[in-house]
Structure formats: C-alpha cells, structure tokens
Amino acid sequence: MKYLSVLALLLFTGQAIAADGPLVEKVRKANDRFKDVKVAIAEGYAPIPCASGLTGGAMGIHYVNGDLLKSGKVDVEHPQAIMYEPQAGGKLDLIAVEYIAFKGPASLEGHLFNFVSEPNRYGLDKFYEMHVWAWRENPTGAFADMNPKVSCDAALSP
C-alpha cells in the first residue's frame, strides 16, 4: 500500500514523466544542432506546410529529409523530420523531431512507433512514425502526434 501511495503522489504531481525521459534527453542532445534551421537546410531537410490538429494543437512545420526517408534507417542522430513552431516575424522554434519508417513494426530504443494507415492526410503509403517532443513539453505525452501547446497561427499570418 505504501508503494501505491508513492506512485499516486508521483503521478499526481507529474514527477512520473521520467519514464520516457532517457530517450527524450538522448534525442535532445543528439539533435540540438537543429535549433538553427539553417543547419537543417544544410543537411538536406526541406519544409512542408505547418500541420494543425483536427481538434486543436499542432505538429508545426516539418522539415523533411527525403534521403533519410528513403533509407529505411532509424537513427537517433538523423531523424527523418525536424519540427518547428512558426513565431511572429518568421522565427522558427525547434520543438520536436519525427522518426519515420515504411517497414515495421519500427522502434527506437525500445519505443514502438505509431502505425499510420492509408489513405492518410499526407498522401503517403502506410508508414510508422514517432514524434519526440524534446524541446517543447507536451501534456499529452512526449511521443504523442499533436501538441496542444503548439500553434500554426504565425505561419498563417501575413
């Protein structure tokens, strides 16, 4: 009973987030270079429009590397997509990365990817993906697709 009380306290206070902490921290350290979007562009990433959630929140602007997408490799240091939230004045804030594989089930460091069937909003064949919100806290989880704390509003502004 004592352990259940401690677990309940940890869950209630939000301190139990550490369960996904090691991978999030590893991803952050391996990809911090992408805070400067020029680095992403130099490494072959190109932008696709900001992706908003159907029921709120967003994923942000994805910078996708076609060569990494085709490679089929899952490597913590080379995500297939890098995600930025647009800010006023055109600034982009690094918020997350996305790992994508067309064969699966796919995983990274023991974390299984989500399966995306076809047809899908991206017009792609079925695939597996995992977002890692390493630079922006996500109340729905560090590996959730959408983040209610992210917006595409600045991308839509003139």
Regions found by a protein language model. Give the residues of each.
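Primary mode marks residue(s) on the alpha4-beta5-alpha5 output face of response regulator receiver
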Residues: 19-158
